[in-house]
Amino acid sequence: MKLFKYFFLFLFFTCSLSAQKNMAFDSLQLREVQDLFADDYGNVYLYKNKDFSLTKYDSLGNQKGKLMLTLPFKIQSVQNPLNIPSFSENAQELKFFDQNLNEIQKVNFRQKFGFIKMVYAEDLQQLWLLDESTKRLIQYNFREDRVINSYPFNIDFENIVDLLVFESKVYVLSKINFAVYDFSAEKILEIPGAHGRKIRRENQNILIVGRNKIQKLDDLTFKTVFSAEMAAIVDKNSAAYFVIQANKLYLYRP
């Protein structure tokens, strides 16, 4: 019976190792990385706040593109690598970049709005804007330069980390909590201490990506779907999880 037990422990340990792959990245590439993104083509994007740079690598660690700006910026997602939205609160503008990280579109908010705290690009036409100066949530068609809707939205803007709008619900991640609102700014749900870096949607699932774990919103709470306790940063694409740990990049397949 004891031998049978040890066999299963060995099998579990072997399977755990086979699920992990050390990707071919130089440790210098991974130092001082503040954010990590992975698209569904196996490409990895590393953001460094030190020089406001985003660098794209293939799965072998070969550089495919590099973007450097003069002000800090926030990449929303690389789920569509042909149109990567990037918002700079300092510059008050949203830029879209192509698969080579070349700029293909710029939307400047200074002339039309007050102070935009956060942006969510719903698609290639519509944006959701949180205007801190007017305390409003704005639905904006930037292709037509037209405001579609504007809602009073008197919430705490100061600590906002990320924003997502889906099916008439507004998901707000802050340094303090995670909250869900309707368009009247009525709070539907609040979960304190989310400790997340960004919100991500996969089909109907809302995910919170933290420093070392990824959680899924499950009714009124979070369910952990991936965790790497010693990780510096984690992220995922539709097929795998990515972990930076001790200046190495690992890939985990479920």
Residue ranges of model-derived segments:
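Bacterial Sec-dependent N-terminal signal peptides
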Residues: 1-24
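Start-of-domain marker
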Residues: 20-83
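A short beta-strand motif characteristic of beta-propeller blades
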Residues: 21-29, 61-68, 103-110, 145-154, ...
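Repeated scaffold domains used in trafficking and secretory/extracellular systems
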Residues: 30-37, 71-78, 113-122, 157-167, ...
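Short beta-strand elements that form the blades of beta-propeller/WD-repeat-like
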Residues: 35-48, 82-88, 125-131, 165-173, ...
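Hydrophobic/aromatic beta-strand positions that recur at structurally equivalent sites within the blades
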Residues: 47, 55-57, 96-99, 138-140, ...
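Hydrophobic, well-structured mid-protein blocks that either form specific transmembrane helices
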Residues: 110-163
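Intrinsically disordered, low-complexity segments enriched in Gly and acidic/Ser/Thr residues
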Residues: 177-227
